[in-house]
Amino acid sequence: MHASIFAKLEQLSMRLEEVDVMLSNPKVASDVKKFTKLSIERAQLTPVNQQFQAYLSHHRNLEDAKLMLLEDDMDIKAMAKEEMLDVKKKLDHLYLELKKSLLPKDPNDSRNIIIEIRAGTGGNEASIFSSNLFKMYSRYTEKKKWQIEVISSSLGEHGGFKEIIARISGVGVYSKLKFESGAHRVQRVPETESQGRVHTSACTIAIMPEVENIEEVNINMSDVRVDTFRASGAGGQHVNKTNSAVRITHIPTGTVAECQDGRSQHKNKAQALLVLASRIFDLQQQEQHKEQASTRKELIGSGDRSQRIRTYNYPQGRITDHRINLTLYKLSEIMEGNLNAIIEPLIVEQQTSQLTELNDVLS
């Protein structure tokens, strides 16, 4: 193990001891905010420390096996060689896992998200596909035991959505779905196509970390314009006689958010403000990533919402993620919400890239 990694793991082990001492303090236990913060830190440190202690234990076993090689008995030597091979495999695996645990953490990974799905090129077929994608993410959310709540939607003229915005909440939502931002292309025969020709259309998805409170973004309410209007349905017809729909504009950035799905103007305003704050926060994050030039490339592509990231080919039952050249013939399964087959390889690709950078630094 590299000396700098060993030193870092020792620091984390010592920090865990400090946290345990603080958590046993009655004064800390009575401070809910501090107790919760320390409990979360302990939950993060514990698995890393367990792996580190296991590594140290196996390393001691390896040293014992080396001593056994000095014995005259050939059977003992054979046992020692076998033991060393087994222990080295375990050490290599643990070392890789420990290096992963020390990789830079995305501070937004624990956040909930705002997901926006917009129909792009392809007219009615794009609107229908946006509905298919929303159902796919809804089913994935259900499998993960997360919660999904529609904030705003605009119906297509012949089904589906021109746009749908939703909030997904739960444990580690952003960490799993952050790579879904980009252009999603579909190739299939529309139901209205009499000649059986395959059409290509697309939807754009934006995944934004949700702000926990508006103060995070520091929005000056004097810079915000609030407009109210009547909610509308498919084709633009008004479905509400009161001005319950709300559009909020952040004048300095030109960022706009609106909500009309809630029953009251008050709820729609609160939801629109949440989306507005999350959009501004996301813009700030993107600017930071541009300054850290290599970061976005490392995160499976540029993060550009216009970048085509995935193709869904229905005639072939094929789905391709262009960022990592991954092709799976499991389209129907994935559209049913079984997204792990495509999400996990993206996470592995990111970790592999980060490990390569770490190894370059250590070498």
Curated annotation (Swiss-Prot):
State the post-translational modifications: Methylated by PrmC. Methylation increases the termination efficiency of RF1.
Q: Residue spans with biased composition (Basic and acidic residues)?
A: 287-299
Asked if the keyword Membrane belongs to this entry, the reply reads no
- Cellular compartment(s): Cytoplasm
Which terms are listed as keywords in the entry? Answer: Cytoplasm, Methylation, Protein biosynthesis
Q: Which domain of life is it from?
A: Bacteria
PTM sites of type N5-methylglutamine: Q237
InterPro entries on file: PCRF (IPR005139), Pep_chain_release_fac_I (IPR000352), Pep_chain_release_fac_I_sf (IPR045853), Prokaryotic/Mito_RF (IPR050057), RF-1 (IPR004373)
Provide the disulphide bond pattern.
Answer: none
| A cellular-component GO term for this protein | cytoplasm
The UniProt entry, under Gene3D superfamilies, shows:
3.30.160.20, 3.30.70.1660, 6.10.140.1950
As one GO molecular function, the record gives:
translation release factor activity, codon specific
Taking the first listed entry, what is the main subcellular location of this protein, grouped into a coarse class? cytoplasm
> Which Pfam family is one of those matched by this entry?
PCRF
Please give the residue ranges the record annotates as the region Disordered.
287-306
Family membership noted in the UniProt record = Belongs to the prokaryotic/mitochondrial release factor family.
**Which purpose does this protein serve, as stated in its record?**
Peptide chain release factor 1 directs the termination of translation in response to the peptide chain termination codons UAG and UAA.
Listed name of the protein? Peptide chain release factor 1
Question: To which species is this protein native?
Answer: Ruthia magnifica subsp. Calyptogena magnifica
State which gene encodes it: prfA
